[in-house]
UniProtKB/Swiss-Prot annotation:
Pfam families, sorted: Rib_5-P_isom_A
Swiss-Prot/TrEMBL keywords: Isomerase
Binding site for substrate: T26, G27, S28, T29, D79, G80, A81, D82, K92, G93, G94, G95, K119
Free-text function comment from the UniProt entry: Catalyzes the reversible conversion of ribose-5-phosphate to ribulose 5-phosphate.
Keyword Ribonucleoprotein: no
Quaternary structure, from the entry: Homodimer.
GO annotations of cellular component type: cytosol
Taxonomic placement: Bacteria, Pseudomonadati, Pseudomonadota, Gammaproteobacteria, Lysobacterales
Name recorded for this polypeptide: Ribose-5-phosphate isomerase A
GO BP annotations listed: D-ribose metabolic process; pentose-phosphate shunt, non-oxidative branch
Annotated catalytic residues: E101
Pathway named in the protein's UniProt entry: Carbohydrate degradation; pentose phosphate pathway; D-ribose 5-phosphate from D-ribulose 5-phosphate (non-oxidative stage): step 1/1
Amino acid sequence: MSEAKRLAAEKAIEYVEDGMIVGVGTGSTVAYFIDALARIQHRIKGAVSSSEQSTARLKQHGIEVIELNHSGNLSLYVDGADECDANKCLIKGGGAALTREKIIAEASERFICIIDPSKQVPVLGRFPLPVEVIPMARSLVARQIRDMTGGQPTWREGVVTDNGNQILDIHNLQITDPEKLERELNQLPGVVCVGLFARRRADVVIVGGEPPVVL
């Protein structure tokens, strides 16, 4: 699948225009995009990064990393996904960067999602849904999510997000109405961010292959 990821990332470079500040996500597919972006870094002003991991890779290539507070709205955000349905709704957060990813997606005019074919699903939920929570609320939120959804929350023990929070992964979901579930989970006290990208879903999905498929 690494070749499919690389091909999707290379295709996404076609959406980068001169003078842009590019929003950059997190994960193994995005790493290929950062490497490809390095080849045209003379054409862009810099990048807004969604994680310390991506920031390190961008700086390794000499790409200037700009704070979102200083960049204003972005024309383009490129990120991967853990799952993608036919409506371009996503599950994200396997890399625990979901909150910053959602912030940058919200600030961007166009959200390009790059995936390999294994990430395409008819119904979201086979991949456990990540939820970032305030540490003191972890057990409370887990109980409330279990009662609300029937899913099985597990604590991603040992993982601390870049924001200092913890992650619950919700197993055994079949998410037939992603927007509704995203809205309901966001209302629980202690929830920082839900790894459903349905209200702000991808505008374009690129599925890696020979040739890549643009949805």
